[in-house]
Design a protein with these regions (language model features):
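Short, Lys/Arg-enriched N-terminal segments with co-localized hydrophobic residues
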Residues: 28, 33-51
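Short, highly charged C-terminal tails/helix-capping segments
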Residues: 194-218
Length: 218
């Protein structure tokens, strides 16, 4: 299994958080994109409490590194992961719709823990404008984090940054929630993205499906 190479996070310039492919080393981890246009019955959507936080783990918070916590969570959940560098880790996780590549990186200079959850998406060229319209609508509905589409790499990515200050530490429950929220959002809105692209459905219908899914699993 090939994982992203080590990156240099020194300085944490805007490029560190914006140039997603080069900096976080997000990989294509799937084959041909699934062309799902309908939403099958399913009983699973990860949500609050789906990922077990390591609240009872004995941590030395004085010397705690947030990526160490992520590694503990990945080990506890038996996810495939690679500790690319002291400040970066990459994981793979299987969802109901897709498999996801999740990368977390710590920028000490900005005191920010950044997360990117990506999955492959290769919509028809003539439906790209509809996809961007859907992205705008979905991001308006999202309280934390947001989606962006990297056309050249054919990847959809959910991005979120946990900003800390004054030497605050990222707690296990916070990191656990970051990962859970990323996968939950990807699972929730994947059908809507597929409906407006391969299904060529209108945006309103696609969003109703996503909202209905969210309420059915609340």
């Amino acid at each position: 299994m090939t994982y992203p190479q080590k990156i240099d996070s020194t300085g944490c310039s805007p490029k560190y958080t914006i140039d997603c492919i080069e900096v976080f080393g997000i990989r294509k981890i799937l084959g041909d994109a699934q062309k799902v246009v309908e939403v099958p019955d399913r009983n699973f959507l990860p949500g609050k409490g789906f990922f077990m936080a390591l609240s009872n783990h004995a941590y030395d918070f004085e010397d705690l590194h947030p990526i160490d916590i992520v590694e503990d969570i990945a080990t506890h959940q038996e996810w495939q992961f690679d500790r690319i560098a002291d400040d970066q880790i990459s994981m793979e996780m299987a969802g109901q719709w897709r498999s996801y590549s999740i990368t977390l990186a710590w920028c000490a200079g900005d005191q920010t823990l950044s997360l990117i959850c990506s999955f492959e998406m290769d919509p028809p060229a003539h439906r790209i404008p509809a996809l961007y319209e859907a992205l705008n609508a979905v991001n308006d509905m999202s309280w934390a984090g947001g989606f962006t589409y990297w056309g050249a790499e054919r990847l959809m990515a959910y991005r979120y940054g946990l900003i800390l200050s004054n030497g605050q530490m990222a707690m296990p429950d916070q990191i656990d929630t970051m990962i859970s929220a990323a996968v939950t959002s990807a699972e929730r809105y994947y059908p809507a993205f597929q409906m407006v692209t391969w299904g060529e459905k209108d945006l309103e219908m696609a969003l109703k499906v996503a909202i209905a899914e969210a309420y059915s699993h609340a």
